[in-house]
């Protein structure tokens, strides 16, 4: 679980996302409140429920990017799902309870990695002994009688192994055979039954081992993983993972505006209002049955986001609106924002193109005038056609660099300066012609 302060979280998000301070602050406070809640007494902790967030803003302004970056900062089970992938219970398609099952799977993976990291030292020792046994096998008749000379030889080989002198030497070792992958095709909505059947068939096979010949360096890695897996207690793992999901789990529901009921539609709407009704108990708090055990959703944080271009937040059913109490509006991006997006974030678009062309030996230099012209071109196209936010920069940059990308392999050692004239020469006719920009940019 992350112990970062709200200021630290916002600072980290600032290095990847330009603007949208309100959204960053809300997300940072929500994440910090997870930590604050765990510091309370047990009886009070149970009463403090998360304040779910609804992010509203046009496409391409950073809603999904905030979710992606938050997943790395949270150090907790996190899942991002598209609301449009689900249908009402009883109809063809995924049920919303699958969200919690996927979140639990993510917690199992996270917990297993943590537990294996804790016992890595013991696993390395056990793996080292197995490699030495393969290098210095004892005669069967002398298996129980260890001579001093044998021990001295073993220590010599141990030293060489640790120094990497034996990395390229090949040995034969017994490695746990991978379980046979049994793929079962199931109708949509029956994923849980499929998982149970797969688990049943996999558990029927004995834990056989397979003798393989490989370099010591590769064998050492495989044996460490195998020994670490043996040291992890499966029951404790499930118990800790479920506790982690219940107390620290975060679900990011993207495209929630796409499941708003349209005013002109009539009859049952199984992929819109039906999904909203199914989401209610999850967000409010219920118990979901997963293959790892029962999971309570009372303290899972839900962050929903949507562009709401064809609908508005009030089109969500009232009960769901009430369960998303914190509303954050993200602002549309200006030409100045585009300039900052091109230069300020870590691994910005301009940095990426400079690095990509550098692999061909071509040096690309972006001048301030060129960056201003690119930002202005992207903003103009957004204003004249559909406003798709910062995603327009990808289209404009790809079009701008298309010719150079094609010829880069023949221009090794050359220098290309991207200034206002370069941008005008490559983009001006497309930006000015509305029909061309509509279909090409």
UniProtKB/Swiss-Prot annotation:
A double ring-shaped homohexamer of HslV is capped on each side by a ring-shaped HslU homohexamer. The assembly of the HslU/HslV complex is dependent on binding of ATP. It comes from the Bacteria. GO terms for biological process: protein unfolding; proteolysis involved in protein catabolic process. One of its GO terms (cellular component) is HslUV protease complex. It holds the Pfam family AAA. ATPase subunit of a proteasome-like degradation complex; this subunit has chaperone activity. The binding of ATP and its subsequent hydrolysis by HslU are essential for unfolding of protein substrates subsequently hydrolyzed by HslV. HslU recognizes the N-terminal part of its protein substrates and unfolds these before they are guided to HslV for hydrolysis. It is found in: Cytoplasm. HAMAP family: HslU. The lineage of its organism: Bacteria, Pseudomonadati, Pseudomonadota, Gammaproteobacteria, Alteromonadales. Belongs to the ClpX chaperone family. HslU subfamily. SMART domains: AAA, ClpB_D2-small. Keywords: ATP-binding, Chaperone, Cytoplasm, Nucleotide-binding, Stress response. This is ATP-dependent protease ATPase subunit HslU. ATP binds at residues 18, 60-65, 254, 319, 391. Its main location: cytoplasm. InterPro entries: AAA+_ATPase, ATP-dep_Clp_protease_ClpX, ATPase_AAA_core, Clp_ATPase_C, HslU, P-loop_NTPase. GO terms for molecular function: ATP binding; ATP hydrolysis activity; peptidase activity; proteasome-activating activity.
């Amino acid at each position: 679980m992350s112990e970062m302060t709200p200021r630290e979280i916002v600072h980290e998000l600032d290095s990847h996302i330009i603007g949208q301070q309100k959204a960053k602050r809300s997300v940072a406070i929500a994440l910090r409140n997870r930590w604050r809640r765990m510091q309370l007494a047990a009886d009070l902790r149970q009463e403090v429920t998360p304040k779910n967030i609804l992010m509203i803003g046009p496409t391409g302004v950073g809603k999904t990017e905030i979710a992606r970056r938050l997943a790395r900062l949270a150090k907790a089970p996190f899942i991002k799902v598209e609301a449009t992938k689900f249908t009402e219970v009883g109809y063809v398609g995924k049920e919303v309870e699958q969200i919690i099952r996927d979140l639990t799977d993510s917690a199992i993976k996270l917990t297993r990695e943590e537990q294996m990291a804790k016992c890595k030292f013991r696993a390395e020792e056990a793996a080292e002994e197995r490699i030495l046994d393969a290098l210095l096998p004892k005669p069967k008749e002398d298996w129980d009688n260890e001579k001093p000379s044998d021990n001295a030889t073993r220590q010599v080989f141990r030293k060489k192994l640790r120094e990497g002198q034996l990395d390229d030497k090949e040995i034969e070792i017994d490695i746990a055979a991978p379980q046979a992958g049994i793929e079962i095709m199931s109708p949509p909505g029956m994923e849980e039954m499929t998982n149970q059947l797969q688990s049943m068939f996999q558990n029927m096979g004995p834990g056989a081992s397979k003798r393989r010949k490989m370099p010591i360096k590769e064998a050492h890695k495989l044996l460490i993983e195998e020994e670490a897996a043996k040291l992890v207690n499966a029951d404790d793992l499930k118990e800790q993972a479920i506790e982690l999901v219940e107390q620290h789990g975060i679900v990011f529901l993207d495209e929630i505006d796409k499941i708003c009921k349209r005013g002109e539609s009539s009859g049952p709407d199984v992929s819109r209002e039906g999904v909203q009704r199914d989401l209610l108990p999850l967000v409010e708090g219920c118990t979901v049955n997963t293959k790892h055990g029962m999971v309570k959703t009372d303290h899972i944080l839900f962050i929903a986001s949507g562009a709401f271009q064809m609908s508005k937040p009030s089109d969500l059913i009232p009960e769901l609106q009430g369960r998303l109490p914190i509303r954050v509006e993200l602002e549309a991006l200006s030409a100045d924002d585009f300039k900052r997006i091109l230069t300020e974030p870590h691994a910005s678009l301009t940095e990426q193109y400079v690095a990509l062309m550098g692999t061909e030996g071509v040096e690309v230099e972006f001048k301030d005038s060129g960056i201003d012209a690119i930002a202005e071109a992207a903003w103009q196209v957004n204003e004249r056609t559909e406003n798709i936010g910062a995603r327009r920069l990808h289209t404009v940059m790809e079009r701008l660099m298309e010719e150079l990308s094609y010829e880069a392999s023949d221009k090794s050692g050359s220098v290309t300066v991207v200034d206002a004239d370069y941008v005008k020469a490559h983009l001006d006719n497309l930006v000015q012609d509305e029909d061309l920009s509509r279909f090409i940019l």
